Amino acid sequence: MSRLLFALTIVVFIVAPLKAGGRYLEVKVAPSKEPGELQLGVTYTLWLPDGVTHVRGVIVHQHGCGAGACKGGETAAYDLHWQALAKKHGCALLGPSYHQDDKQNCRLWCDPRNGSHKTFLQALDHFAKEARHPEIATAPWCLWGHSGGGFWASLMQTMYPERIIALWFRSGSALNAWEKGEIERPKIPDAAYDIPMMMNPGAKEKDDKRFAGAWTGTYNLFKLYRAKGAPAGFVPDPRTSHECGDSRYLAIPFFDACLAMRLPESGAKLRPVNRKTAWLATALTDKAEPAATFKGDPDEAVWLPNEAVAKAWMEYVKTGAVSDKSPPIAPRALKLTPIDGAMELTWDADADLESGLQAFIIERDGKEIARLPEKAVGRFGRPLFQGLSYHDTPERPLPAMRYLDKTVTPGGKHRYAVIAVNGVGLRSPRAEAAR
């Protein structure tokens, strides 16, 4: 009997408030006691953009080890910023959440050879049927992994290199574990050296007793792959330790460039990396230049896919974030509904691809009456509408794109506007409605 426990295709208690478009599918896999199968349960949540006719790829946002990380991973597929990337390229967004408590060995799942690669593929097969998009089962992947998620991604790279568009290793890889003999050393196939990848530890991890392995593991993985000519980069985060910080502001442009470069117009066979557009940089510096003019050793240099990512990289290694000079697009589908003497506003909006979504400003008759959230808080990075956790995921409760104006005069006529504010504070044009 299949271990897939099929959930409702629409997870109403989570999805209904978001008003961000798309649909959510969820499937749970029960733990197994069979040899070679996953001994932990896992929930996979998939988001599909509205109007997608052919799913070109799957962007996987994989959390790290421990109960807190697993809980953080529950909201990954609901992230409006990562959804904007997926929507641009006709991709699905997948957020796994393993059912691991703090007493259980993380390697039960973060080493995919212990069964998590099988459940991952089973979930994709299920989603392909449930969504009536058979191409999901064979679509290529972008793999983002934090800590144990990076461990998982680095081994998946050796198992399914032909399926992987690009990889982002945030503070994690399996290299140290296989070098120490703690796990079986994988055989790295030649195809693994053709995948664009970026290693991204926190600079404060380097001399940290607990997290130093995240630094050495990612840096040594970078050197191993770069020595073989792989398109690999290294970008330390100057502000952080093991938390993800504002790394998304470089990870998303990196994936954006790789998706544009490698996704085919049809089919699942990936296009090769275009090395003519590459920029290179000496590792642990803050200067990059076109590969054609680079004077250092290219086999030791940081590889960057194009000029835009190179400029973002140069900023990030100095500041831990990336700036944005373009305002977001306006919200849409603003609807006004009278409710018990008040006026309910609902709308939809996409996150700004460059810097995400910080807040909404509500205006009535040309005057600001509210902000959502009232005060955005950034505990681990820039303040965002959905919050930002240690794990680069939205924080619960997930906010609604909804406002109830209780101060309006009943029966009066008013014009309302909603303005989106992106992650750096730039405002969109107004979305307006009158009643």
Residue spans for each PLM region:
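The feature captures the conserved acid-bearing segment of alpha/beta-hydrolase catalytic domains
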Residues: 165-249
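Recognizes extended acidic, P/S/T-rich segments that occur
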Residues: 359-411
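Alpha/beta-hydrolase active-site loop
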Residues: 108-135
